[in-house]
Amino acid sequence: MILEAKGISFGYKKGINIIDNFQLAMQSHERLGVIAPSGFGKTTLCQILAGYIKPRTGQVLLDGADLHKMKGYCPVQMIWQHPEKSVNPRLRMQDIVAEGDEIQERILDGLGIERDWFKRFPGELSGGELQRFCIARALGKQTKFLIADEISTMLDLITQSQIWNFLLQEIAVRNIGLIVVTHSAPLLERIATRQVLLERQDNF
């Protein structure tokens, strides 16, 4: 499976693009690491690639099909830097998880998710506990590409290592493509098969 971005441009103000003519082509076995300065639209780009935001111009294609026209579960899933922004605070975790694709028990175990957490509301979980849920939700059975936007910030160092060990094993077994956005060069050295510094009009 191939994920492509063709001529992606986007801006929040009319006539001003923070992303301009962005190009990407990657296969599902690749792990792409992205480093970029603040203000270069990293999170916005992630949201476009995951189908949350439509670009001003250009297309995101999954095996040639327009991602933004797909219905149902999106095969490109995003894990947000701030997990509280990706959940409904009025729903219990069991209801939030039920909105997505089926999650296998081994994923819950691999991420160290306690079953009684399902009965809690997002505000009753720590940032790290909520982030684990969001990672599990993104690893539904139909996921083909995973976008991780600074996902380690809510986790302590030991938990970071455990989570990344599990994630790398899971995506290798399932042949899931991975895009990692981070400020940590050592993390990318460990994880990525390709690394890029995001600059204006870069082609990946």
Where are these regions (language model features)?
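H-loop/switch region of ABC-family ATPase nucleotide-binding domains
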Residues: V181-H183
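A short, flexible loop at the N-terminus of ABC-type nucleotide-binding domains that lies
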Residues: M1-A5, S9-N21, S28
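Helix-to-loop junction immediately C-terminal to a conserved catalytic motif
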Residues: A50
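Conserved ABC transporter NBD signature motif
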Residues: G58-G72
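Conserved ABC ATPase signature
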Residues: F121-L125, E129
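Q-loop/switch helix immediately C-terminal to the Walker
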Residues: H82, P89-I103
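Hydrophobic anchor residue at the start of the ABC signature
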Residues: I135, I147, I163
